[in-house]
């Protein structure tokens, strides 16, 4: 009766197939290509967080966090501040300097 109809699996529609193609590519590890792409993205920004970089590059936040640490070690970025959630990085050339004392 009705059980036979429920046992049949629904064939995926064209729209569902399109949705599956829209998923982000899963990159399990940090590659040199990914670091180079991030270096170009960071150079254009005034500041960057792991979330902001993840959105721009289409990767997970954990991967973006690792990439930012690598760029900090290379001297491309400077850790400006860290709160309980995410660090804020500045490109090395855009780090604010304090005015001289006594002026």
Swiss-Prot record:
GO terms for cellular component: ribonucleoprotein complex; ribosome. Residues 1-23 are annotated as: Disordered. Disulfide bonds: none annotated. The keyword Ribonucleoprotein applies. Gene3D superfamilies: Winged helix-like DNA-binding domain superfamily/Winged helix DNA-binding domain. Keywords: Ribonucleoprotein, Ribosomal protein. Belongs to the eukaryotic ribosomal protein eS25 family. This is Small ribosomal subunit protein eS25. It comes from Aeropyrum pernix (strain ATCC 700893 / DSM 11879 / JCM 9820 / NBRC 100138 / K1).
């Amino acid at each position: 009766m009705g059980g036979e109809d429920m046992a049949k699996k629904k064939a995926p529609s064209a729209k569902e197939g399109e949705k599956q193609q829209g998923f982000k590519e899963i990159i399990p590890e940090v590659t040199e290509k990914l670091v180079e792409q991030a270096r170009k993205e960071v150079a254009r920004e005034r500041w960057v967080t792991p979330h902001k970089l993840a959105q721009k590059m289409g990767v997970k936040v954990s991967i973006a966090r690792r990439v930012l640490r690598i760029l900090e070690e290379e001297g491309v970025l400077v850790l400006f501040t860290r709160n309980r959630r995410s660090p804020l990085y500045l490109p090395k050339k855009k780090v604010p300097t304090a005015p001289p004392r006594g002026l």
